[in-house]
């Protein structure tokens, strides 16, 4: 009986963890789609308060324009990975641009709000 309870607990726990990762992955995909459509307000809605202050609509627009100037036009996303760094959940989405590939690193706080958003070289973590 004890083994059954432990097994059920572990299955439930893994389902909750997977659900959390899946939600963060979906939010990260929404960010990329919103960048492509110049819908920066949708991105900001997923930010925590610090990010809302640091990256208003104008700065997000500038970030995306600069990326497209330096890296070429955005083409597609491919590999998606997830990680846990201290108390933060992190998703990495490989973004393919015309001239190079970058990873979009999205850091989530415990409330599933974006607490960090970075475009980094594809081999960096």
Listing of model-derived features with the role each one plays in the protein:
Residues 4-19:
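Sec-dependent N-terminal signal peptides
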Residues 16-33:
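Short, low-complexity N-terminal intrinsically disordered segments enriched in polar/charged residues
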Residues 26, 41-86:
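Short solvent-exposed beta->alpha transition segments
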Residues 79-125:
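Exposed beta-sheet edge and beta->alpha loop/turn motif
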